[in-house]
């Protein structure tokens, strides 16, 4: 899904590290596709791409507010939301993955936690 994102910061040492604000969430992402120089304070169109490099860690949870929580100082996040039609929906964001339908369809309509290794952003 394409979002309007506000660029909040760009790391001076790692140019692919971009801080954004989207749907009220402040996220630090890895810019996997950066076709132009970004300006802090400008709004751009971009797609958020959760990356899982190994095993999918998905768990049903309860009594937790949907959110996107950064794990440590890297690009890893724990995404908490409701699973709907193969998409994890939380705080105005939607993260879709065919694995949700194939392997986790039994969690449809439930609140789940998903561990992603890296949250990429692709500017369009």
Model-assigned labels for residue ranges:
Residues 19-22, 86-90:
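Generic recognition of long tandem-repeat/solenoid scaffolds
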Residues 23-38, 91-111, 116-121:
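Beta-strand/loop nucleic-acid-binding surfaces
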Residues 40, 57-59, 66-71, 75-77, ...:
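A structural signal for the main folded, soluble domain(s) of proteins
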Residues 1-12, 61-87, 113-114:
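Structural detector for short beta-strands of small beta-barrel domains
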Residues 11, 22, 26, 49-52, ...:
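Short beta-rich binding modules
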Residues 15-61:
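Acidic (E/D-rich), amphipathic helical modules within compact regulatory domains
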Residues 41-55, 81, 108-124:
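Flexible glycine-rich surface loops and low-complexity tracts that mediate binding to linear polymers
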Residues 39-49, 53, 75, 80, ...:
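Intrinsically disordered, low-complexity regulatory/interaction regions
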